[in-house]
């Protein structure tokens, strides 16, 4: 399987998982706690997949526009010295929020389009609140930490829909640019 097909399958799988859980119930209040937790985790898996896809596709599209540190971060690589003094690569530990912002920025840069994920909107605020829910579920300290409220489900679903839309918008802007360039090159060759 080539890298493009892997990316397509990855996005399809994580989005399908979210949709399966989210669409199973008519009302959010009907979603049992265990499935609320699964939904939050699945949505964050989707966010991580989107970040990976944006960074991978950016490197495939136009790697020459990036600085070495951008390439390393896009590959999620860090470097260290072994006990014998040899340089070696290790997996970078990237914080969620800056990594997501970076993924959108590097994808826009690769496609040379003017796009920036807005951090001044209520959807971004919902995403930030959702990060706290994800963190609480991932590192529970008391039984109440495992409860996901209806408001928290609303936030995480709003963040999901927004990131999904932003991903689509970025893709459409990139495609539009490609089609415009193709049309212009056909005009100049005629």
Question: Positions of the model-derived regions?
Answer:
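Charged alpha-helical initiation segments
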Residues: 1-41, 58, 185-189
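Charge-rich, solvent-exposed alpha-helical interaction surfaces
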Residues: 10-13, 17, 103, 159-162
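Hydrophobic alpha-helical packing segments in soluble, helical-rich domains
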Residues: 43-50
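Long amphipathic alpha-helical segments
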Residues: 56, 60, 147, 168-190
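Flexible secondary-structure boundary motifs
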Residues: 62-136, 140, 144, 162-176
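Short conserved catalytic/interaction loops centered on acidic-Pro-aromatic/His motifs
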Residues: 145-151
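Short secondary-structure subsegments characteristic of cysteine-rich extracellular domains
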Residues: 151-167
